[in-house]
Swiss-Prot record:
The keyword Signal applies. One of its GO terms (cellular component) is cell outer membrane. Induction: Induced by both low pH and low Mg(2+) via the PhoQ/PhoP two-component regulatory system. Responds to general intracellular signals that are present both in initial and in progressive stages of infection. Its main location: membrane. This is Outer membrane protein PagN. It comes from Salmonella typhimurium (strain LT2 / SGSC1412 / ATCC 700720). It comes from the Bacteria. Keywords: Cell outer membrane, Membrane, Signal, Transmembrane, Transmembrane beta strand, Virulence. It is a multi-pass membrane protein. It is found in: Cell outer membrane. The chain crosses the membrane at residues 27-36, 66-76, 82-92, 121-132, 138-148, 175-185, 191-200, 231-239. Pfam families: OMP_b-brl (PF13505). All four putative extracellular loops are crucial for invasion of mammalian cells. Residues 23-26, 77-81, 133-137, 186-190 are periplasmic.
Length: 239
């Protein structure tokens, strides 16, 4: 992840160096709002001696959680008259949970299992923007970005009637991509209010566990995908 950002920040440094004397282009943004996180494609599979004896695709879950982040970027409009921006962005989001149940056959007996998945995603993106400058203080824009998504999954299973409560955790760094729209309002020459919407796809995270008892082998696998619809309000300061 560090190498990723070391490479991505080079264009910003070069652009800044080219216009350092004018002190124009660099900006920072802080933002907060609601992230509507979608947890989908949720699979839960139990197997015994390599034979699947219980598989379930759990219901998708969409939940609004608090989201926020910071960004540093370079606006090419003032120094170069190009209506584009390039920025590095970090956004965190609250936890989303998805619940369901499945029936399996364990050692010859039917068992119902309550399953709960908790997902949290943080993204580190390189975003590009195209600004539609006009004669007003409002500037609409479109955006697209790629980067890394750190997705954490906590999977809880409770076999009903057995007094067992087990939680497994895993995390994964995935390729992430996104696109969005928004508008900024210039309060002063240096301060802007930014309202935006972005869709971010964070990929898939999975968990697995194996248990051996003599000649018997039981296994459990779970996986889910995550995406977010981010509705943010931010304040930007341009240097």
């Amino acid at each position: 992840m560090k190498n990723f950002f070391a490479v991505c920040i080079i264009p910003l440094v070069v652009a800044w160096s080219a216009t350092a004397s004018a002190k124009e282009g660099i900006y920072i943004t802080g933002k907060a709002g609601t992230s509507v996180v979608n947890v989908y494609g949720i699979n839960s599979t139990f197997s015994q001696d390599e034979i699947v004896n219980g598989h379930a695709t759990l219901p998708d879950r969409t939940k609004g959680v608090f989201g926020g982040g910071v960004a540093i970027g370079y606006d090419f409009y003032d120094p170069f008259q190009l209506p584009v921006r390039l920025e590095l962005d970090t956004t965190f989001r609250g936890e989303t949970d998805a619940k369901g149940g499945q029936d399996i056959i364990a050692f010859g007996d039917p068992v119902h299992i309550n399953v709960k998945n908790q997902v949290r995603m943080t993204t580190y993106m390189v975003n590009g923007y195209y600004d539609f400058h006009n004669s007003t203080a409002f500037t609409p824009y479109i955006s697209a970005g790629v980067g890394l998504a750190h997705v954490k999954l906590s999977n809880n299973t409770i076999p009903v009637g057995f007094g067992i409560n087990e939680t497994l955790s895993a995390s994964k760094n995935n390729f992430a991509w996104g696109a969005g729209i928004g508008a900024k309002y210039a309060v002063t020459d240096n301060i802007m209010i930014d309202a935006s919407y972005k869709y971010i796809n964070a990929g898939k995270v999975s968990i697995s566990k194996n248990h051996y008892a003599g000649d018997e082998h039981t296994a459990y696998d779970a996986d889910t995908k995550a995406a977010s619809n981010d509705f943010m309000l931010g304040i930007t300061y341009a240097f």
